[in-house]
């Protein structure tokens, strides 16, 4: 086509075409303004003919490359290198296209072109039907949303094109500091889940539920590099991108591992602060539990010195171990190993005292026999006095009779009476008691 134009106008050469893009000056004696009207008309007809041929030429027709041809379009300046991201994959804000983010509910500020998305992410219908997000989207984490940008375009046709989880998916904020990356990646993972991409997020074991597609990987890479500028990435993230600038999945996997590690650290601190020990469990098991927690915290960057560790351990001691609080509390250089030596000593002493006690248990039949042969010596003996009263009353009557007759009887009778008084009186009762007269 261009060769045909040049053949129609032999006065125009390639040198004049190159002059439009090169700095070389073309010397000619002809005044460029001295052009006849007939020449101008011929130029107009030729340009009209060239435009008609250009419109009828199919877009897919291959044009042979001409090394000497210079395009009349101005040369495009490549975007600057953005840290670990490659220059050929970077996109500027001017390359934004709202249709590429319509299915995900992303605003029009996302810089990637439609050809990077597969048809499954490219919704049908005109682009103006899809909602636009306010200018507050993509702001830093600490920046509040302005009140003027809280309006959304409502469209009934967009309901079927949006995700089934939420009508509007809010993108993550812009990362503004390496220290904010742990919080930012949480919002980014939440954004992927709301965008129906939760299946590609690594699970606890580090593997996703399903395999990520090429289009999803492109989507992941483009959104990550826009909302996480390289100058604000942590060092460990830059190290991953320096090996493979598209390995966003590895960054997400490492981030999830760090989240779980942070949760474990919090659990270890709570466990160490709430220790309880009274000797009910072996001292070895208690020591292993405590030392593992301290070592795990130290490895994760949370240093627990001996003084703090001993104070936390002693605070949870009870029973016979409680006195260790007062015997060791003045030792500033006490270590955890020394404290556990004392705990082991008390535990072994408890176990030795328990083993020294007799375990023999007497037979219940022996206890029954002993109770039968047992005589209570402390309990006084009870004697029934009723039979004695009748006998005593008789003896008193007989004595009174003897006394009354002794005054009228001769002296021999008195001698017999006095003789009888010195002899014991026999009482006929079942107890066979022998009472002397003086007791009356």
Curated annotation (Swiss-Prot):
Cellular localisation: Cytoplasm
Keywords assigned: Cytoplasm, Phosphoprotein, RNA-binding, Transposable element
Comp. bias regions, Polar residues: 1-23, 48-60, 127-152, 419-428
Region (RNA-binding) residue spans: 299-401
GO biological process: viral translational frameshifting
Principal subcellular localization: cytoplasm
Coiled-coil ranges (or none): none
GO cellular component entries: cytoplasm
Segments of skewed composition (Low complexity): 153-165, 402-418
Presence of the UniProt keyword Ribonucleoprotein in the record: no
Pfam families: TYA
Induction (free text): Ty1-ML1 is a weakly expressed element. Induced under amino acid starvation conditions by GCN4.
Disulfide partners: none
Site residues, Cleavage: 401-402
Single GO molecular function: RNA binding
Modified residues (Phosphoserine): 416
Region (Disordered): 1-88, 126-173, 352-440
RNA-binding is among the record's keywords: yes
Bias kind Basic and acidic residues: ranges: 429-440
Top-level taxon: Eukaryota
Domain remark in the UniProt entry: The C-terminal RNA-binding region of CA is sufficient for all its nucleocapsid-like chaperone activities.
Subunit details: Homotrimer.
Main function: Capsid protein (CA) is the structural component of the virus-like particle (VLP), forming the shell that encapsulates the retrotransposons dimeric RNA genome. The particles are assembled from trimer-clustered units and there are holes in the capsid shells that allow for the diffusion of macromolecules. CA also has nucleocapsid-like chaperone activity, promoting primer tRNA(i)-Met annealing to the multipartite primer-binding site (PBS), dimerization of Ty1 RNA and initiation of reverse transcription.
Note: Retrotransposons are mobile genetic entities that are able to replicate via an RNA intermediate and a reverse transcription step. In contrast to retroviruses, retrotransposons are non-infectious, lack an envelope and remain intracellular. Ty1 retrotransposons belong to the copia elements (pseudoviridae).
Protein name, entry field: Transposon Ty1-ML1 Gag polyprotein
Organism for this UniProt entry: Saccharomyces cerevisiae (strain ATCC 204508 / S288c) (Baker's yeast)
